[in-house]
Amino acid sequence: MKTLERTDPVAEYSAARASAVVIPRSHEGRVRAVGRDRLDLLQRMSTNDLTAMEAGEARLTVLTTPLARIVDLLWVLNLGERVLCLTSPGRVAVVRRWLAGYIFYNDQVKFEDASNDLGQLGLYGPRAGAVANAMVEGAAALVENRFLERDGALVLRGRPLAGDGFTIIASAAQIETLREQAIAAGATPAGEEAFQMLRLAAGWPYGDHELTDAYIPLEANLWPAVSFSKGCYIGQEIIARMESRGKLARRLSGLRLDGLVAEGSEVRAGETMAGTVTSVGTLPGLGPVALAYLKTALARPGTSVTVGETRGVVVDLPFV
């Protein structure tokens, strides 16, 4: 059995790419929605079509402001008599307050903070399915965006990270036991630094880095979380207009850099202000990289840029 001792972020990142890692995610938020109108309210408040969701199905969706700015990216899991929403770290209060502000007098729905009641793990890497199946029988047979519940644990096959990706949710008292089971099944224990390296390599927008009210979902490359055939929702007009005209002011892009830079730094293409750096890291085999929102005309791969005195080039996402 592997020990519970972590190694180092680079070794953990390499383990994810070669096999599987288990990473604590309990600092991300969990909101339980109950009541007759739980899905109806989420439907009229967010970008994806949630009306036809079956029990056992999960979908990504974005809460947006009337100006189509991002409030948060949610996983919405249909558990039949209730719904579980997974939020970004530190966003539970914001999400609950935002949703509560649009409840009409005859709506039957309540949003409860389940973050302390439930714990969360992430399993990533090409062997994540085998590890998940050793923990909860049947997990490996799940298709993407589906989940099952067994013996008090919920297992969701979500977006692949380093080859595959599962989210495990269980009671706070049970989650450490499940982590130990994952390690016993061959997963390497990893931490937040390794997760950030993995999601950076994948080009995922995340939390307070890219998922803020400065940006619109399409600019964040969140097209799979947006339905263009559903009815009205908060911010829908602006998003539909951007899609129909095919004109985005900016786009989340990758940068290969000669050195590390600070998040929030300006990106310039010659004398032109091109955009803003939102995430920075060093990836094995690639060196310093960054995510940045760039003006669309300057977001073409191969475009030379500078961040302060550091040179770089725009590249396609994902990095790996």
Predicted feature residues:
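Glycine-centered loop/turn motifs
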Residues: 55-58, 138-148, 203, 208, ...
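Anionic-ligand-binding alpha/beta catalytic cores of soluble enzymes and soluble regulatory domains
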Residues: 167-256
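Glycine-rich, small/acidic residue-mixed loop/short-helix segments
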Residues: 69, 74, 215, 220-236, ...
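Acidic, low-complexity central loop/insert segments
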Residues: 21-25, 30, 72-199, 205
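A generic structural motif
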Residues: 37, 80, 115, 127, ...
